[in-house]
């Protein structure tokens, strides 16, 4: 069994870690960074970029650069949050045939699971490069408040990336695992997790290696992206007041504003004032326009105050569900990049009445926790038991469109609950069961996970047939349903097919595409390596020709010149085999040059030697240790 890795698939950044013995280790990517931007881009020639290279070209290629894709995962196109996102991002969000929200680049649609899979592939490659062996299994984190569709879509992303997802683990729970791994004694902790796109709060009891989640709450559409958006809107409004030009209509300018907003937000966590300078942001008939603005921390805090306040209510609900007061919480752990903001720390301190714990790296702690869970599953980490909860109530639609709860929110998972259903009409042979997740009283106001028909019920008067339906939520927080006709004891396993979601055929197709992309990437890498090698050979040959060209025959020199010209022509194209062949031809041709160099070197060496007959015998005497001492 190979290593199981832990991946924090974040909205803004992702991170991968692995257990080395009993110690978790965050792995640096190819660029030398410990986190990777969760960004995927497609260039003009169809090349796919992931991470920092994708982020770097985002300003000049906004319509094909996908960021914050996690906000769309597992959502339908009609979801109010999707509609909100459409107005915030420069790329195209489209409606998939199954009703889900997908994205599009150059007319080609991609599911959010697919885009996420490209990021997961990058994390997989990062781990493989470090470990020196293939990786096929992972633990992936999700926001605690993710529903079933979002969890399933994340699991699908892992599958598309070529990973068997052994466990989906909640981000605050992972953070608690990392925080409490070496802690002795017991206590109650609150994990306040404000990341790039989502907010979670979890209350846990920790003691003797047992991590028990008491409650969880959150908002899957609240995070750093919203803080950036507020700042972008402010900058655009200020610019419009001064210049009469609306930058929101210019995708290129908007992307530059977003980049500047993110940078300013980060700077204001340590500085009380920052300057935003964007020369040549746009132009009109009077010439180019520049954006230059001073921004104070106080102004930024005023712009986003309501967003920070939105995190307080979930904290209140989580405490209420756990049956605790703020004073009964022993420690508050901050997770997510946004918790570096002083105002956020101040609000947390006010609410919980204590200074939050800042001893963990908010960007890495979730991946570390995922690696710990991977270690538990692999048997490398002993005496750790994780008891998580389901964040949302699960139930069905009953007469009158009412939501009847079967499993309440904050129930410890895995869990199982059975309910007996019957028919509403005489001789009814089929019944439709609609499964929902949420907290509203009417089913239609909650998230429809899917529906299924029970068929083949023996004809009988209404209310007589007894069909036992069992709902079970596994350790990943994913729902499974079984149905049994109590009269015949015939059992049927039902996979909830959500109204949206990817089918097995969709996933298989995307897996094949990902494999094909990986093969294309390999060829592209080989081509770049071959070109670099060819150019290096040309450079060294031309340098040697300039130095030793006079030492080789004119015919050999002509052959070398011709080989260089042929390779240069080939390097302008994309033919890998042609480049390799022409490089080999130049290496062969330049062998004559090598011979001339060695010959010249040998001759130079001989002329430096004195004739044997002129060797002079020298007198010598032995030197004692004291003779080495020099007088000052």
UniProtKB/Swiss-Prot annotation:
Function comment: Acts as a chaperone.
| Key words of the record | ATP-binding, Chaperone, Nucleotide-binding, Phosphoprotein, Stress response
Record lineage: Bacteria, Pseudomonadati, Pseudomonadota, Alphaproteobacteria, Hyphomicrobiales
Report the induction information. Answer: By stress conditions e.g. heat shock.
Q: Which InterPro entries match?
A: ATPase_NBD, Chaperone_DnaK, Heat_shock_70_CS, HSP70_C_sf, HSP70_peptide-bd_sf, Hsp_70_fam
Protein's name according to its UniProt entry: Chaperone protein DnaK
From the UniProt entry, list the residue stretches annotated as the region Disordered.
601-632
From start to end residue, where is composition biased (Basic and acidic residues)?
609-632
Q: Which top-level group of life is the source organism from?
A: Bacteria
PROSITE patterns the record matches: HSP70_1 (PS00297), HSP70_2 (PS00329), HSP70_3 (PS01036)
GO MF entries: ATP binding; ATP-dependent protein folding chaperone; unfolded protein binding
Question: Per the record's keyword annotation, is ATP-binding included, yes or no?
Answer: yes
- Could you confirm whether the keyword Signal appears in this record? no
């Amino acid at each position: 069994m190979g290593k199981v890795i832990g991946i924090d698939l974040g909205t803004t950044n992702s991170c991968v870690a692995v257990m080395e013995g009993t110690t978790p280790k965050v792995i640096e990517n190819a660029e030398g960074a410990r986190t990777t931007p969760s960004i995927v881009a497609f260039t003009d020639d169809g090349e796919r970029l992931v991470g920092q290279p994708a982020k770097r070209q985002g300003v000049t290629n906004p319509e094909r650069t996908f960021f914050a894709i996690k906000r769309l995962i597992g959502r339908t196109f009609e979801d109010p949050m999707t509609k909100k996102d459409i107005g915030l991002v420069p790329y195209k969000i489209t409606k998939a045939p199954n009703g889900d929200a997908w994205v599009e680049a150059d007319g080609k649609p991609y599911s959010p699971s697919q885009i996420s899979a490209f990021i997961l592939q990058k994390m997989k490659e990062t781990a493989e490069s470090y470990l020196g062996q293939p990786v096929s299994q992972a633990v992936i984190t999700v926001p605690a408040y993710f529903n079933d569709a979002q969890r399933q879509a994340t699991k699908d992303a892992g599958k598309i990336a070529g990973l068997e997802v052994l466990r989906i683990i909640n981000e605050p729970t992972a953070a608690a695992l990392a925080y409490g791994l070496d802690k002795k004694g017991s206590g109650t902790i609150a994990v306040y997790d404000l990341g790039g796109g989502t907010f979670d709060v979890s209350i846990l009891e920790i003691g003797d290696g047992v991590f028990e989640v008491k409650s969880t709450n959150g908002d899957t559409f609240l995070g750093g992206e919203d803080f950036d958006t507020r700042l972008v809107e402010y900058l655009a409004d200020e610019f419009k007041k001064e210049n009469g030009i609306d930058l929101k209509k210019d995708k290129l300018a908007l992307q530059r504003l977003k980049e500047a907003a993110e940078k300013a937000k980060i700077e204001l966590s340590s500085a009380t004032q920052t300057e935003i300078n964007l020369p040549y942001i746009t132009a009109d008939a009077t010439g180019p326009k520049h954006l230059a603005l001073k921004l104070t921390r106080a102004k930024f805090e005023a712009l986003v105050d309501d967003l920070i306040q939105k995190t307080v209510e979930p904290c209140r609900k989580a405490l209420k569900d756990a049956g605790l007061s703020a004073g009964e919480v022993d420690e508050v752990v901050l997770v997510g990049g946004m918790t570096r903001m002083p105002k956020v720390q101040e609000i947390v301190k006010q609410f919980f009445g204590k200074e939050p714990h800042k001893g963990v790296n908010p960007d890495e702690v979730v991946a570390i926790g995922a690696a710990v869970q991977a270690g538990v599953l692999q048997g490398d980490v002993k005496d750790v038991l994780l008891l998580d909860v389901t964040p949302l109530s699960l139930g069905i639609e009953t007469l009158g469109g009412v939501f009847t709860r079967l499993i309440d929110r904050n129930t410890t998972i895995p869990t199982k609950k059975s309910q007996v259903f019957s028919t509403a009409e005489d001789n009814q042979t089929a019944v439709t069961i609609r499964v929902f997740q949420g907290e509203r009283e009417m089913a239609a106001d909650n998230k429809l996970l899917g529906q299924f028909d029970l068929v083949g019920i023996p004809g009988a008067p209404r209310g007589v047939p007894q069909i036992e339906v069992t709902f079970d939520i596994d350790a990943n927080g994913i729902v499974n349903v079984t149905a049994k006709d109590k009269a015949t004891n015939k059992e049927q396993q039902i996979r909830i097919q959500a109204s949206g979601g990817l089918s097995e055929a969709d996933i298989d197709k995307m897996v094949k595409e990902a494999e094909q992309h990986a093969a294309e990437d390999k060829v592209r890498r080989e081509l770049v390596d071959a070109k670099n090698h060819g150019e290096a050979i040309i450079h060294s040959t031309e340098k040697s020709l300039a130095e030793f060209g006079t030492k080789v025959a004119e015919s050999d020199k002509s052959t070398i010149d011709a080989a260089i010209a042929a390779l240069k022509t080939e390097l302008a194209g994309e033919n890998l085999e042609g480049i390799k062949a022409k490089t080999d031809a130049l290496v062969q041709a330049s062998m004559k040059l090598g011979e001339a160099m060695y010959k010249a070197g040998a001759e130079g060496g001989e002329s430096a030697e004195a004739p044997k007959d002129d060797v002079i015998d020298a007198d010598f005497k032995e030197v004692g240790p004291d003779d080495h001492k020099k007088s000052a």
